[in-house]
């Protein structure tokens, strides 16, 4: 379909210059509208603006016409009158780019220095930070100083570097004498906490002359956190200096936990810390003493610190450490240390039942496990497998017939056309706005409508937006079923497993790109793609852009998954963790556990929360997909369940 559309696009473009006036008449059919839309887009890309202007009036009834209008306005935003932009935004209140256009035009009016026009166009605070800075600067320019200073303060108090457009607002605020030096200290604290050393240095250098002593100390501390003890001893003890010292101390602990541990008494004395503040420092160091390389003395100190801690996440980390080393006594100790609310989590209820089974208290344990089985997800399935019972999936059925009123309207019409043109990311923006505006019942119908139209990613997105967790068919559609069947055929990886990986990685959005460069359905990095193509002699791949094509992505992704699956003896726990965190880390974790623990303990003891959640999800998703493919939804194979880790 994709290639056919590209060929059609080229053929249509070839005839653009041959258009006659009669051919510009309004298109009657959707196919004709699509044809004209393609011609206009091609003409626009070729800068044939006379053709664009000639053809656009004939497409006013086409659902994607507002996108053409948007491009027309933004291509010449520097010369647009405010009334044109205002009318467009008002006429298209649900169009995603119209929502960003307001902020863009605020910035344009600021460039023109039309301050009154800016406030007339945007009487309310705009959305983006840059536009807000221009908005409050306009307030100052029109004599509304108090509102300007209030806005400046709100925009100032962040640890991030703000856009250049904010500089002039901050400058007039400072010149007015309304900027309290304490505002500098507060922003320095936020920047220090965010690790923005450059901003800390700039801000400290701008402080008034009578603050130069503390400013110099701040700059030294930001550039070299190891001077924290000197900072603590040479500055007066205030809430600000304590907070700065704590941030620097955390940096020291990341580099040298033992040095930080030994520093705590001196730091506490110099900054007059109370017990809660001292415990915060202990917690910071305790997090860094969870490895296998700690001494007995460090381990005792760590456990003493955690025993006094109020940090639930730190205590949970200690529970997982006990699980990872097969320390049953420690497991019991640290589970008991958890607060009641945390004990109600699925994972800790399961491990409490596990301890009860070990003590022969089978009835109590099974009661907990049966209660868990009433829920959905990883641990409810684990509970069923633990007591040898079948896990019953709870599936809510969405209405097969969708209310026609939901499928009408400009938003749905735009979604249909965007999906036709394979503009998935833009369609997702439209869809998100549409789904968010509906009731839960309507969201279920929209999920079903997307499912019926094979808009797999939109089906999933609707279930997430509506928290429709038991609508499993719409949450886990058999997307790209034929492609997965073809590219897992002859491989050892089950089709359901490959689909579970893709569902976890992309939620079935074929055009998604991660911030680090992973692309497409199975979120493949360009380097991984190149290596896999070479290793498996996959023909036809030449550039990372091809990873956005579903077939190419599935071909390469299933090949790489097969590679890691075979590396780890066809064990999905290992290969899933390796797909997410890398094979090297999985081997390290296996070396640490050294065959002392079972499968569930290994999963729960994975130190990276993202990877731990990833493995749990993939195993559960695999079970769902096996169910929809006609198999039993067992979480783990007998081999995976029975081996030691």
From Swiss-Prot:
Signal peptide residues on this chain, from the entry's feature table: 1-27
Disulphides: 133-166
Alphabetized Pfam families for the sequence: SLT, SLT_L
Active-site feature positions: 505
Protease found in the keyword field: no
Cellular compartments per GO CC: membrane; outer membrane-bounded periplasmic space; peptidoglycan-based cell wall
Cellular localization per UniProt: Periplasm
Catalytic activity: Exolytic cleavage of the (1->4)-beta-glycosidic linkage between N-acetylmuramic acid (MurNAc) and N-acetylglucosamine (GlcNAc) residues in peptidoglycan, from either the reducing or the non-reducing ends of the peptidoglycan chains, with concomitant formation of a 1,6-anhydrobond in the MurNAc residue
Keywords tagged on the record: Cell wall biogenesis/degradation, Disulfide bond, Lyase, Periplasm, Signal
EC number: 4.2.2.n1
Stretches the record annotates as Slt-type domain: 492-582
Gene3D superfamilies: 1.10.530.10, Bacterial muramidases, Lytic transglycosylase, superhelical linker domain
GO molecular function: hydrolase activity, hydrolyzing O-glycosyl compounds; lytic endotransglycosylase activity; peptidoglycan lytic transglycosylase activity
InterPro entries cross-referenced by the UniProt entry: Lysozyme-like_dom_sf (IPR023346), Lytic_TGlycoase_superhlx_L_sf (IPR037061), Lytic_TGlycosylase_superhlx_L (IPR012289), Lytic_TGlycosylase_superhlx_U (IPR008939), Transglyc_AS (IPR000189), Transglycosylase_SLT_dom_1 (IPR008258)
Name of the protein in its database record: Soluble lytic murein transglycosylase
Origin species: Escherichia coli (strain K12)
Organism phylogeny: Bacteria, Pseudomonadati, Pseudomonadota, Gammaproteobacteria, Enterobacterales
